[in-house]
């Protein structure tokens, strides 16, 4: 399973990482909103770390204009906690 963590001002998801300062406001999704974001609403230009069987999802826009990914879409059993950890990392920079 891909590892997702927030540490030292960075967000790690699977094999990739990004400085939290390059990310916008994270949005935690569950239920129908998460299903839509994983399905018909999925942004093909985003970096995806999506695991089947996990309802929660965090979508974070990338604010670095040089980054080809427009957002990060990350599965999480605790999307509120992941979004809060990203916000804390952004505030510490």
Label the model's feature ranges.
Residues 70-93:
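Cytosol-/stroma-facing membrane-proximal "stalk/adaptor" domains immediately downstream
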Residues 12-73:
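Non-transmembrane, membrane-adjacent beta-strand/coil modules in membrane-associated proteins
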Residues 1-10:
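Transmembrane-cytosolic junction motif
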């Amino acid at each position: 399973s891909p590892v997702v963590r927030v540490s030292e001002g960075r967000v790690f998801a699977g094999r990739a990482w990004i400085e939290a300062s390059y990310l916008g406001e994270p949005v935690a999704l569950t239920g129908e909103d998460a299903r839509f974001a994983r399905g018909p609403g999925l942004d093909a230009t985003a970096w995806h770390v999506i695991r089947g069987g996990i309802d929660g999802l965090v979508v974070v826009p990338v604010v670095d204009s040089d980054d080809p990914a427009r957002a990060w879409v990350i599965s999480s059993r605790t999307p509120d906690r992941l979004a809060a950890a990203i916000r804390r990392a952004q505030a510490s920079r």
